UniProtKB/Swiss-Prot annotation:
InterPro entries: T4SS_TraH. It is found in: Periplasm. The gene is traH. GO terms for cellular component: periplasmic space. This is Protein TraH. Keywords: Conjugation, Periplasm, Plasmid, Signal. It comes from Escherichia coli (strain K12). The keyword rRNA-binding does not apply. Residues 1-24 form the signal peptide. Involved in pilus assembly.
Length: 458
């Protein structure tokens, strides 16, 4: 079962203000993510009452909705047959045959080799053992020569790196397209044209919609995949941000490869999202295909909209409402339900004990990293889902998946560093546990005193 996509892609929304301002950018997505944390819910309390005719009891009700993200999991193109006044277009395969002139040349060649044949015939008749040994040696030489070709091709496809692998696969793509479009006379002609014949580019330019993603020419793989998700419609900067996190492969007009490595835990990006400031992300000079990528384009996040500031404001608001017994709004409820830290308990318990609750503010960094890593993980999940729906070359998908796996490992490593801050959380837990025990002991003592006092007056 696929993991539930938490409504977190919206949080870090209240977090980022990017310069220059834009209607759709990383800032707006993080604000949406932050504002829609948790569930949209509505509840009614259970109750019991006695009427004139009867007694009544009802259990209350619960309504909860979480944010929905649309992911296009399957894309299908149906086959078709074109028929019109000019005829019917259908590809039924092809075959080749030799003509009379070729047959005559072949017979002449056989006759020119007649001396060798007569020699073999004489050996077979007089000394068959020698004939058998000669045939064995000839077969061995032929097998070795044929293996030279196949081993060369295998070396390209197995150990030659990404470029040879894509080169071999593109020859196959070219031949597939040529076969579907009936461009060459037969298989041998298509192999010739798609390799040394120089027809590969012109053939691949005729790729149908279902084959275009297989052609590694003039394509940015991650950009192409993200463009199929409506979540990124009109949000060029968010796509650039995701591409920076996951990395990509950019194929130029001649198949040249420009790799973009994953920068998931780039310190400048993490710091800017947590505390505000400037981070550098990959930027596309063209928003259509993103073939020209500038590696270090600055994106500015204001301090007020960074995660730490937003979380501090929310904690203060929740604390004040707890003191005044005011209901929490949806944003505050979502914030409490989205983090693994029992925030509400750490705010309310000290109020009940009459002590300072400043301890919770010591955990602002930890809470911020907890939410930020959820946001980044969900963006990577979106990217992984869209790559999986594409018809990309196997070698390309392998490289992209390696990039995203590397990004996931970077997040895990970063999380292990953040876990160090759990020491502070454990200290808070111990302090809160001790205070609750004290309160419980005081309440029990007061209850017992009241009980004995009440008993003595009877």
């Amino acid at each position: 079962m696929m993991p539930r996509i938490k409504p977190l892609l919206v949080l870090c929304a209240a977090l980022l203000t990017v310069t220059p301002a834009a209607s759709a950018d990383v800032n707006s997505d993080m604000n949406q993510f932050f504002n829609k944390l948790g569930f949209a819910s509505n509840t009614t309390q259970p109750g019991v009452w006695q009427g004139q005719a009867a007694g009544y009891a009802y259990g209350g009700s619960l309504y909860a909705r979480t944010q929905v993200k649309n992911v296009q999991l399957i894309s299908m193109t149906l086959p078709d047959i074109n028929a019109g006044c000019g005829g019917i277009d259908a590809y039924l395969g092809s075959f080749s045959f030799i003509n009379g002139e070729q047959l005559q040349r072949f017979v002449k060649q056989i006759m020119s080799n007649a001396a060798g044949y007569f020699f073999d015939l004489a050996l077979q008749t007089t000394v068959p053992e020698i004939k058998t040994a000669k045939d064995f040696l000839q077969k061995m030489a032929s097998d070795i020569n044929s293996m030279n070709l196949s081993s060369c091709q295998a070396a390209q496809g197995i150990i030659g790196g990404l470029f040879p692998r894509t080169q071999v696969s593109q020859q196959k793509v070219c031949q597939d397209i040529a076969g579907e479009s009936n461009i060459f006379a037969d298989w041998a002609a298509s192999r010739q044209g798609c390799t040394v014949g120089g027809k590969s580019d012109s053939v691949r330019d005729k790729a149908s919609d279902k084959d275009k993603e297989r052609v590694t020419k003039n394509i940015n793989i991650m950009w192409n995949a993200l463009s199929k998700n409506r979540m990124f419609d009109g949000n060029k900067e968010l796509k650039e941000f995701v591409m920076t996190l996951t990395g990509s492969l950019v194929f130029g007009p001649n198949g040249e490869i420009t790799p973009l490595s994953a920068r998931t835990t780039d310190r400048s990006i993490i710091r800017a999202m947590m505390e505000g400031g400037t981070a550098k992300i990959s930027h596309c000079n063209d928003s259509d295909k993103c073939l020209k990528v500038v590696a270090d384009t600055p994106v500015t996040i204001s301090r007020d909209n960074a995660l730490k500031s937003q979380i501090t404001k929310l904690l203060a608001s929740i604390q004040n409402k707890a003191v005044s017994d005011t209901p929490l709004d949806d944003k505050e409820k979502g914030f409490i339900s989205s983090t693994t830290i029992p925030v509400f308990k750490y705010l309310v318990d000290p109020q009940m004990l009459g002590v300072s609750n400043s301890m919770i503010y010591q955990l602002t960094d930890y809470i911020g990293y907890d939410i930020l890593l959820q946001y980044i993980q969900e963006l990577i999940q979106q990217a992984r889902a869209m790559v999986a729906t594409g018809n990309y070359d196997e070698a390309v998908i392998g490289h992209i998946n390696d990039n995203m796996n590397d990004a996931t490992r970077q997040i895990a490593a970063f999380q292990s560093q953040v876990q160090v801050q759990q020491d502070a959380l454990l200290v808070v837990d111990r302090q809160m546990s001790y205070m609750r025990q004290q309160l419980s002991a005081r309440m029990l003592s007061r209850y017992q005193n009241n009980y004995h006092f009440g008993g003595s007056t009877l």
